[in-house]
Design a protein with these regions (language model features):
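Active-site neighborhood of HAD-like aspartate-dependent phosphohydrolases
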Residues: 1-45
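Short, active-site-adjacent cap segments at secondary-structure transitions
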Residues: 11, 57-59, 121-123
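Tryptophan-centric aromatic hotspots in well-structured domains and transmembrane helices
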Residues: 12, 54-56, 102
Length: 151
């Protein structure tokens, strides 16, 4: 099972009103959100994570896995591709299209997957999606929904 993971609003809730004072602070995941997410993954050792966040446009891949616990970091396998900027306007569900392109590029079109995102409008209504409340981030309810997809 592939998990396409957004970061902002998921592992970093939007409830922080102050501006981060450093890059390290900006990149710090909420410990509760991270624990809920990682604990679900520990119950499903075959699940792999692909980063679908805009972070992939800011940071090289090598920066992201170390932000997770080592046992989870080893299961983060890549980024979704960025689509050609000339064609972006043609896609109603941009993140969904990036997921489909990742699956195509990796010969995984028939692989089961689920996305975790705080903007459900990035995906068609029938998509396998754990929709996150960006104020709370990935919480116990999110963990339950993700577990149902992974079972």
């Amino acid at each position: 099972m592939l998990i396409f993971l957004d970061i902002d609003g998921v592992l970093i809730p939007d409830r922080r009103h102050e501006t981060p004072s450093s890059l390290a602070e900006l990149m710090k995941f909420n410990s509760d959100c991270l624990n809920h997410f990682e604990n679900v993954l520990r119950s499903y050792p075959n699940a792999r994570v692909v980063i679908s966040s805009s972070w992939r446009e800011i940071f090289p891949f090598e920066v992201i896995p170390p932000l997770f616990s080592p046992d989870i970091a080893s299961r983060i396998i890549g980024f979704t591709p960025s689509l050609n900027p000339k064609n972006i306007h043609q896609h109603k569900y941009l993140r969904h299209q990036e997921v489909l392109e990742y699956l195509r590029q990796n010969q995984a079109e028939n692989s089961p997957w689920v996305a975790i995102d705080d903007i459900p409008e990035h995906y068609p209504p029938d998509s396998p999606l754990v929709a996150i409340d960006d104020y709370n981030g990935f919480d116990q309810n999110s963990a339950k929904v993700l577990s149902e997809y992974l079972t």
